[in-house]
Structure formats: structure tokens, C-alpha cells
Amino acid sequence: MKTVKISAYYAILLALIALICTALSTGIYLLTKSKIEDEINKQRQALLLEVVPQAYFDNPLSENCQRPNSEKLRAQRIDRLCIATKNNQKTAYAFETVAPDGYAGRIRLLVGITPTGTILGVRVLEHQETPGLGDKIETRISDWILSFSQQQLRSDNLADWAVKKDGGKFDQFAGATITPRAVVNQVKQSALSLLDELNQEN
């Protein structure tokens, strides 16, 4: 009988400890949730400014983002589209897209583009490429990704939109052609899809 009472006591004690720990964890989460969300929003806004400079818009760009309705855009793996406006005129777009064929898997990109096809900037949001080789797509490692800035995408220069090994004008990396090829191809194809969609709207 005494053993049963002791066991019940410890069971209740453990339950109370678990309850207190859960309450503390929940409290910490609730206290830090807004700070974490604020930090994520700040990082997102900073990245948006890297691909669509402030001079292009006077609207709250990060608040004007949504999943595109167009099946064509979604088929090109454009899963988030932000619209920049200035004086109520659409001046640029920022979109997230995924290159599915990186050396080590998917490469998530953020692309800024004008309605006339000028690439304002490209940044890598996420990747798993090989350190020392494919990770040169990051600005902290290399300035390669900056080579997209101010490049014009037109029907008469599509052949240029490839790595040099494939006859284009973009550099590849020594020992790592697959990664830059995947990025160039995805920027090209997704941007062309967006421009085609915009032309149909007009």
C-alpha cells in the first residue's frame, strides 16, 4: 500500500513538472514570437531592397506579396510575387522561384525585374550546394550573382542567357558548372513566364 502511495506521489510530481515546463516553453515562445516575426520581416525587406531598389517604389513592397493565381507562373515554380508601384504605376516585380536542378538539390531564388525585362537583381534565399564550389552563388562568398543586375532579357538575346560552357555569357565555376547553370536557367525561364503573363494582361 505504501509503495502505491509513493508511486502515485511521484506520478503527480512528474506531471506537475511536465506541466510547468510546458507552460514555461509556451510562455517563452509567445514572448519571442513577435520578435522572431519582426526579425524575419526585416530580413525579407532587406532582401527585397537588394533586388528592387527603393527608387522603384513608394508602396510597402513587402506587404504587396502573394501567391500568383496564374497556373503558368506556378508551373515555373514562382510561388511568391511582390508588386512594386510608384505614383500608382507598376514599376517592378520581385518573385521567389526555385531552381529544381542544383547539384545538391533545390535552389530558392529571389528575382527583381522591371515590366520591360531588365533584371534588377537576383539573390539566393536557400541552397544546399557544395561548400567551396557551388556556394559561390552566395554574395558572402562571391559576387557572381551580381552579374544578373541590369541584364536585359529580350527575345533576341535568349541565347546569351546561359553559362559560357553552353554558349552564353554567364561565367560558370571551376569544377561546378551545374549550380550556375541551374540558377541562370531558372532566372531566365521564370522571368520569361512573368513577362509573357504581363504582356497578356496588357
Curated annotation (Swiss-Prot):
The name this protein carries in UniProt is Ion-translocating oxidoreductase complex subunit G
Could you tell me the membrane topology recorded for this protein?
Answer: Single-pass membrane protein
Q: Which residues form a coiled coil?
A: none
- FMN phosphoryl threonine (modified residue): where? T177
Superkingdom field: Bacteria
What this protein needs as a cofactor is: FMN
Location within or outside the cell: Cell inner membrane
The species this protein belongs to is: Pasteurella multocida (strain Pm70)
Primary location class: membrane
Print the keywords alphabetically.
Answer: Cell inner membrane, Cell membrane, Electron transport, Flavoprotein, FMN, Membrane, Phosphoprotein, Translocase, Transmembrane, Transmembrane helix, Transport
Subunit notes for this chain?
Answer: The complex is composed of six subunits: RnfA, RnfB, RnfC, RnfD, RnfE and RnfG.
Q: What does the UniProt function comment say about this protein?
A: Part of a membrane-bound complex that couples electron transfer with translocation of ions across the membrane.
EC supergroup of this enzyme:
translocase
